[in-house]
Design a protein with these regions (language model features):
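A structural motif shared across PLP-dependent enzymes of the aminotransferase-like
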Residues: 97-109
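A short acidic, Gly/Pro-enriched loop at the edge of an enzyme's catalytic core
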Residues: 203-211
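Short helix-loop-beta connector
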Residues: 88, 117-120, 143-149
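Short glycine-centered segments of the SAM/dcSAM-binding site in methyltransferase folds
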Residues: 92, 149, 232-233
Length: 344
C-alpha cells in the first residue's frame, strides 16, 4: 500500500511517500481502507517528537514506534478481527486509528463509529479528535449549563469551531475570540458575540465568563483568571510555545498547583476518543446541530505540505499576537494519491 513513512523525528523533511505492507491487526481491531485522514497540530508534535515528554508517553524515545503518522480517519471497513461485533466489511466509518496517512490503517472497534450519513469522507476525517476534545472539555470539565456565559479563545480553529457549536447545543451564551478574517465564519457556526483579538482585549472588558475554554493560546494564567467569574471554570487545552520540554503545558501545571487554593476551578485535561462520544457527535451532525469546518484537502503524497500548513498557519495567524494564536481549521488528507492538486 502507499503510505507516508518516517524513520526518525524531525521536520516534514523526514516524511517519505512509499510502498509498505498493510498493517497487521489484533482480534479486536478492524482494517480500514482509508479515504481521508485528518491533520491537526498533534500530528506535527508527534512527527517532531516535541515537546520531549511525547516520546516518554510511548511514541518512542529515539525514533517513532509507529512509522506511519496520523490518527484521525474516515473510510470503509475492509476486514474485521474475530472479536469485533460492531462492524462488518463494507461499513463506512470514522474515528481514530494507527497510521492513518496510508491507504489502510488499523483501528480498535471501540474507537470507531458509523460515518454520519450527511458527511463526505473528508469532512468525517476531521471529526473524531477535535470534536471529542471540544465535547469532553465543555461537558465533562467545563460542565456547561444552559444560560451560562462561555468564552472560547481560539474559536476559529479545529477544536474551537466544534466548541462554539457544542456550547450552543448546551444552551450557553457564547463569546468567541478570533482574528479579523475569521469573525464571519465564527458567527456562522453560532457564536453570539465575537471579539477580534487584533483590536480588542477580552480581559479589559467588563464582561466576566462562567466558563473559559482556552484552546492552544498563550494568555497568562493571571489574565485568564481576571476574565473568569469568582466561581467560574477555566479549561486549558494545549498551548503553543517553542519549549522543547514543557511546550505550552507550563500554564496547565501552574493552574493545577493553584487550583486547591482559589475559588475558581482551574485545570486541563487530555481528551480520549471512544465509541460512545463518537455516536454523540454523529447524532448531532446528522441533526444539523454540528458541522465540521474544513480549510483544505491535500492528496496523500502532499501530506508534508498539509502538516506544514497546519503547523505554521496563515500569515495572519503568524502575526505577533501569540496569546490568542489560532490553529487553522482542520486540513484533511485524501488517500487518493492520484489526485493532482489540492482543493482550496
Amino acid at each position: 500500500m502507499k503510505a507516508i513513512v518516517q524513520d526518525a523525528y524531525g521536520s516534514t523533511d523526514v516524511l517519505e511517500f512509499r510502498d509498505i505492507d498493510k498493517p497487521d491487526m489484533a482480534d479486536d481491531e478492524v482494517l480500514v481502507r482509508v479515504h481521508a485522514a485528518g491533520v491537526d497540530r498533534g500530528v506535527w508534535h508527534v512527527m517532531a517528537g516535541l515537546p520531549y515528554p511525547i516520546r516518554l508517553a510511548g511514541y518512542g524515545l529515539r525514533a517513532p514506534k509507529n512509522g506511519v503518522p496520523g490518527t484521525d480517519l474516515a473510510g470503509v471497513v475492509e476486514v474485521v478481527g474475530k472479536d469485533v461485533t460492531r462492524f462488518q466489511p463494507g461499513d463506512e466509518v470514522f474515528g481514530v486509528g494507527t497510521g492513518s496517512f496510508a491507504e489502510y490503517a488499523r483501528a480498535g472497534d471501540d474507537k470507531l463509529a458509523l460515518k454520519p450519513a450527511n458527511l463526505t469522507f473528508a469532512q468525517a476525517a476531521a471529526v473524531a479528535i477535535s470534536g471529542s476534545t471540544a465535547l469532553q472539555a465543555l461537558r465533562d470539565r467545563g460542565q456547561v449549563e444552559p444560560g451560562q456565559k462561555v468564552l472560547i479563545i481560539g474559536a476559529s480553529g479545529g477544536v474551537g469551531t466544534y466548541a462554539v457549536q457544542l456550547a450552543k447545543v448546551f444552551g450557553a451564551d457564547v463569546t468567541a475570540v478570533c482574528s479579523t478574517s475569521k469573525m464571519d465564519m465564527v458567527r456562522s457556526v453560532g457564536a453570539d458575540h465575537v471579539i477580534d483579538y487584533t483590536r480588542d482585549d477580552f480581559v479589559d472588558r467588563q464582561q466576566r465568563w462562567d466558563v473559559i475554554l482556552d484552546i492552544g493560546g498563550n494568555a497568562s494564567l493571571s489574565r485568564l483568571r481576571r476574565a473568569l467569574t469568582p466561581k467560574g471554570t477555566l479549561v486549558i487545552i494545549g498551548g503553543e510555545t517553542d519549549g522543547r520540554w514543557l511546550g505550552g503545558s507550563d500554564r496547565q501545571i501552574r493552574a493545577l498547583m493553584l487550583y486547591p487554593f482559589v475559588g475558581q476551578k482551574l485545570g486541563t485535561f487530555v481528551s480520549s476518543q471512544n465509541h460512545q462520544d463518537l455516536i454523540v457527535l454523529k447524532e448531532l451532525i446528522e441533526a444539523g446541530k454540528v458541522i465540521p469546518a474544513i480549510d483544505r484537502t491535500y492528496p496523500l503524497n502532499e501530506s508534508p505540505q498539509g502538516i506544514q500548513y497546519v503547523a505554521e498557519g496563515t500569515p495572519e495567524e503568524r502575526s505577533p499576537s501569540p496569546s490568542e494564536r489560532e490553529s487553522p481549521i482542520r486540513v484533511t488528507i485524501s488517500t487518493d494519491h492520484t489526485q493532482q492538486s489540492r482543493q482550496k
